[in-house]
Amino acid sequence: SLVGSEMCIRDRPYTNHRKDEFGGSLENRMRFMDMVMEEVMRAAGNDMAVLVKTNMRDGFKGGMEIDEAVQVAKRLVQDGAHALVLSGGFVSKAPMYVMRGAMPIKSMTHYMNCWWLKYGVRMVGKWMIPTVPFKEAYFLEDALRFRTEIKEIPLVYVGGLVSREKIDEVLDDGFEFVQMGRALLNEPGFVNRLRTEEKARCNCGHSNYCIARMYTIDMACHKHLEEKLPLCLEREIEKLENQ
């Protein structure tokens, strides 16, 4: 994955300040990625497909933009990747760019064990993690640029797919596969409904409660919990889902 990972850090000028052959120009910044891909492709052999998740934009000022990201994607094709998963964002700088919506701060801090971190994030969290509005298939416009530029291998679209109508649109636009996360967490049987219902749409309300608890306990939809949530969290979730 090139979404805030070690390879991502190496090929961004924002995080790569090296002065040697691994820094400076995009060609140099991609050198480490090339080395990793060479080893991965050698290890994979003919036994498995290698899919690489790569950014289209980082989503913050000074991060990688689409023109350079297309060049990175083309290099991954040259390096032997069998398919690319097109994403965006940078976990430490622009987490909601990839997730979209708002971060439920009360839910996030509810599961933190460290008291000073809990209260600190409650005080400044909304400024630390700014909201990025959600819309269905929010990465599609950028992904179409990659589809135009890259013809050699399959592309996997990910980002805000919650209905059969939009999934069909993405596939009709030339993407071989789609990837879903929160839609399936909300409704594990959603794929079965997609097969039989033309108007199928999952019931995810995009409160991001599942994301808020992901790093401290586990990832779960609030609609499928065995325990009852505190009233303050229920109100926070309801407010976000009704925005």
Where is each model-derived feature located?
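Short, small-residue-biased leader/transition segments that mark boundaries at the very start
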Residues: 2-9
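Active-site mouth loops of central-metabolism enzymes
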Residues: 55-67, 156-157
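Extended, intrinsically disordered, low-complexity segments
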Residues: 94-243
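Generic structural signal for well-ordered alpha-helices
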Residues: 33-41, 69-74, 140-147, 167, ...
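Short, well-ordered coil/turn segments that N-cap beta-strands
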Residues: 44-50, 80-82, 151-155, 175-176
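Glycine-rich tight-turn/loop motif centered on a GG-T
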Residues: 10-33, 61-67, 72, 98-136
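A cross-domain feature marking catalytic cores of carbohydrate-active enzymes
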Residues: 53-56, 86-88, 159, 182
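Conserved, mostly hydrophobic/aromatic
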Residues: 40, 52, 76, 84, ...
